[in-house]
Structure formats: structure tokens, C-alpha cells
């Protein structure tokens, strides 16, 4: 796992941004799976969020975690959930980003039980700003790195863009930067920023 922290003005709570940087890698001597959509895209979003908060000092500490082992049964996130740098009880919200480089106008998401209390804020922001045609909320599943935290009562949301033109390259050797679609990159970034600002203004 690779972890960065941007210190906020307060240290009693924090936000956490996660994405896995591993992929399938090599298969034999000649076959290589690049993993641009899955999940260089999500990793790029959390790096952009980190750059934003370096320039704009946040109210609370921010943790940016690039997990390894997601494609090996969530090993990296499971380990971190058992050995967190800050108590899990201090997490105001965790955002997990996986496969963002597609062009489906509806954004797939999963929300933990504890995250549902503030989920209407995501819907309100999206309705006002029109970032996505809709937020397509699905049942919580153990398919990405938010899951170990959801099981430990952390408020979290998982964003993934699937079903567009890039999805046909999922887990293939053609998941390359040439097939990377950036149209939902900024809307995802902006929705998260607006959510944090909206949560702060309501405190």
C-alpha cells in the first residue's frame, strides 16, 4: 500500500480516498494486462484530489491510499482496515474509486449502511450540477476496496463507471491508455469536492 497524508486544520476526524493500483500484470512471458481503466483511472483521481488539497488546505486530515492486492481478494485494503493509521471511527467519509475511465452517463455506486445518512447530499449535488445522468446506487458487494471498511461500520461510497465503451476491455490486454475515456473524470472529482464542502457547511 502507498499512503499519503495532507494535514488539515483539525486532526480529530479525517477523510479517506482510496483506489487500487494493482492489476493482473503478466501472464506468461509475452502477455501483459496494462489496467488503464482498471485502475490507473481511479488512482489518477485520488492523485488529483491530493494535489487539490495540497493547494487548498482542508479542515480535516486527508488520507490518500493506493491499495495493492485488490485483484487478489482485497488484500491491501483488508490489511489496512486492520492496521489503520488513524482510528476508523475518525473517518467522516471514505471514497473508493475504481474504473473511472468510461463514458456511461450514469455513475454506478455502492454505499455502506453508515454512509447512507449522507447519501442524499450526493444526490442533491448531482441533481443541481448535472454531473451524471443519475447515480445508479447498487447493493453493497465485496467487489472493491471499500468493502472491508463497510464491514467495519465506516461511512463510505464506491464509485465505478461501467457499461460504456471502455468496459469491453475490462481484464483484457486492451485496457490501455488508447482506450481510456476521460469524460467522467472531472465530474467524479467535482462531485467529491462538492460533497466535502457541503458536509462542512452543514456542520
What are these regions (language model features)?
Residues 1, 25-121, 142-145:
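Acidic/histidine-rich catalytic neighborhood of metal-dependent amide-processing enzymes
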Residues 104-203:
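Active-site-adjacent substrate-binding region
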Residues 18, 65-67, 97, 157-160:
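Generic beta-strand/beta-sheet core signal
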Residues 6, 19, 25, 50-57, ...:
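Sec/Tat-exported extracytoplasmic proteins
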